[in-house]
Amino acid sequence: MAIHSIEPERRTLHGHFSRDLPPCLTINSGDTVVFRTLDARWTVGLSVSGKWDTNAPQFSPLNPELDSGHALCGPVAIRGAKPGMTLEIQIKDIVPGSWGWTFAGGWPHDVNRRLNLVDSPTLLSWSIDSEAMTATNQHGHRVQLRPFMGVMGMPTDEPGILSTAPPRATGGNLDCKELVAGTRLFLPVAVESGLF
């Protein structure tokens, strides 16, 4: 069984799901893929302040039509995967980068309205210690980490561009904090080769 790597570059990144996306990699069942990912906002570094903020540099070039969702790596085609089959994803490890961010409020969303956070956004910039698995924000608050991938999935057999925001039967924006290192995710395959 082979080990493959995917780095974030134009040919491996997309901001939507689609059955029409060409795979950036084709693997055999049982192979391992190491993904190096960007954050949800396509951020590639910190601001000049040394912290993450809304001025942090983003991946470029972005296509407004195709890259409006989360920064996804792939898709990966699995030889022999066919609609009606189940894909097992084994999450062997998740190693966070050296920084991260938390952003809440600042736009009219149902949750923000209920919490009265529509007008005033709150931004926390985190320095991450991946060995100690802790993160410390700009206010000195430290939290223990248990990293998980927010978005994992494959396209449905629908034509066109599908948003990364909603979860679907084939995966997507699951935000399942239980999907940590050592766990497995089972998803139904809807298109030829899966395109994970």
Give each language-model segment a name.
Residues 1-64:
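N-terminal, Lys/Arg-enriched amphipathic/low-complexity engagement segments
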Residues 8-18, 65-73, 162-170:
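Short, structured beta-strand/loop micro-motifs enriched in basic residues and often containing a Trp
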Residues 13, 21-23, 72-77, 175:
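Short, conserved secondary-structure segments in the cores of folded domains
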Residues 35, 86-89, 187:
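A generic structural signal for residues embedded in beta-strands
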Residues 40-52, 94-104, 193-196:
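Short, Lys/Arg- and Gly-enriched loop/turn segments at beta-strand edges
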Residues 70, 93-181, 186:
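Intrinsically disordered, low-complexity linker/loop segments enriched in Gly/Pro
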